Structures are given as structure tokens and as C-alpha cells.
């Protein structure tokens, strides 16, 4: 009986080893990037093809590392978890470095800067940040002009994170010291396009999202516009997330980013999608 059990265990160990080798061999020459391809011009799809700033930068990184790039299009909120679990080698989706995210993954050096802006319907009573917040003499928010305001965001993005905070931290919610939200004014959608559709149908009063996708949404939809002037909601840096234990890949990505910045590749990619002449 013991011999049979030992034989079974040995066979199982051999199978596990062979599977591990097969798995490693399958991905040996491939980098799997997790993204959410609904965030133009950083990542989007044309037919079956992936396009955008992040896609082209990721491709350039893969080429630097002598790898093939494979792209997994997933919900934004599942990217970090998938990178943690090893399903994906890295996540790249117009992703901002935050303290909360740093608890789960590491981030590369910055490769682009994003601005969170406010989209409103034409004729909206919201004409500036002053239309949303009540400010003290120091310019800090102390309350809302309209406590019934509803704000649309793409769930799990930094727009969602920022808006979900307390009003005194430039959020739109009432939040207790322990983090409990007592009044939630944020309406979360799976994509920015859904949030914009909600704005057009009057379900939300405004949408807060990155400036570049915002410009694409406004161009594709009549009757909405971005608040202009000094009305940016937040300014942030984008980076690539990597599993904490995968320090070797992080170092390789940072080295590739430095070289691609130095030789002008990243600048040309960004200029292609966001011309400075616009």
C-alpha cells in the first residue's frame, strides 16, 4: 500500500513539474499585458486590433526585451488582482500610482501625465469648480453647492477614488473618519462611455475622467463639453504595475522606459495620439 501511495505521489510530482515547465515555456518569449481597451487614446480597439498610446509603448518595451506582446482586455478593476496572481505580467491602462495600489503592486517610472477633467451637458448649471464646491478663504473645499449632485465615473479609476473621498479632501462624498461613506454621490460605470451616456440621459450631473478620453467622448457626442479654464479636477502621473515579487521585470521595464524616453520613442508615440499643436 505504501509503495502504491509513493508511486502515485511520484507520478503527481513528475506531472506537476512537467506542467510547470510547459507553462514556463509557453510564456518564455511572451509578455502578457492586462488593459481595459475602452480608454482612448491610451487603449482602445479598432475591429480586432488594439490601438493607443499604452499599446504602442508596451509593444516597444516588449521589443526591447526581445519578447512578443500579448494583450488581455479585462475590466479595469481586475487588472491589479490579475497581476498579483500572475495571470498577467504587467498592467498598463492609463493607471495612476496611489498609496492604496502600492499596497498590492509595484509601479514603474512615469511615462505620461494625465489630467482629470469635468464633462457637463451644454447649458448645465455647473460652469466651474466654484459651481460644485463651497470654498473657504484658503481655497479649500468645505461643502457642496448642490448636496444632491450625482457624479459619473468609470469604476475603480482614480476619478472614482478621488470623487469617493470626503469633501474636505476634494471628494464628493460625506465620509466618516473610519472611511465609512454616509452619503455616496458617485455613480460608477464599467466604462467611460457608459458614464457619458448617463450624463446625456440626465442620470448624472457631470462626469469626471481623464482629459484625453474626455476629448474623444466629447468629439463623438453632441450636447456635452469639458469645463475649460482653471477647472482641472486633478493632475496625475501614469505608470505600469508589476507584481511585487517580480522585481526583475520591473527593472527591465524601467530600463526600457528610460531608453525609449531617451531616444524619443515615447515622445513620438504620445505626439501621434495627442498632437501638441491641438
Question: What are these model-predicted stretches?
Answer:
Residues 28-95, 188, 263:
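Extracytoplasmic small-molecule ligand-binding "clamshell" domains
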